[in-house]
């Protein structure tokens, strides 16, 4: 089971990724984790990536693709893998095809922007304990105060509406073409299977739809 999971920040990808990896016994691979692991292991590619990152540069697609090939050749990928947040761009997707990396499924978890803004911008955090509340879905007993200590709750900088909308616009500009790329690939080559899943409703309902798409 070789899967790409697409979805905007706040669409609930993390929950579904955890379910898929546990259900099929496959690792979740994100480029960030992969880069850190390669750097830590001191592989030739890892050292190359480190020198680029140390000088403040962006790791090239070529290097990323080679790291991906190195990563998916490891023993834990024998039953497949789940790419999380990769590929991000058309050149990366094209390079994957060119490198002969086979994929079975591309699953997009789609949630309306306004729903995502409400989900994320409503989060409030008690910094000392890490307890998370939501102004609509899980409000504290007293607005703006932690239930246990009574201390102030804060909104993280990443959770402000302005930041969320910016991240969404970046996601759409990068990912919309990717969706079309994989739809086209599925239509012309029959693989990978592309599935569009509405990410609203209970976790169980969405998980059921994901499972159906992967079967």
Curated annotation (Swiss-Prot):
It is found in: Cytoplasm. One of its GO terms (molecular function) is adenylate kinase activity. The lineage of its organism: Bacteria, Pseudomonadati, Pseudomonadota, Gammaproteobacteria, Pseudomonadales. Keywords: ATP-binding, Cytoplasm, Kinase, Nucleotide biosynthesis, Nucleotide-binding, Transferase. Belongs to the adenylate kinase family. One of its GO terms (cellular component) is cytoplasm. Residues 122-159 are annotated as: LID. It comes from the Bacteria. Its main location: cytoplasm. AMP binds at residues 31, 36, 57-59, 85-88, 92, 156, 167. This is Adenylate kinase. It catalyses: AMP + ATP = 2 ADP. ATP binds at residues 10-15, 123, 132-133, 201. Disulfide bonds: none annotated. It comes from Pseudomonas fluorescens (strain ATCC BAA-477 / NRRL B-23932 / Pf-5). Monomer. Catalyzes the reversible transfer of the terminal phosphate group between ATP and AMP. Plays an important role in cellular energy homeostasis and in adenine nucleotide metabolism. It is an enzyme of class 2 (transferase).
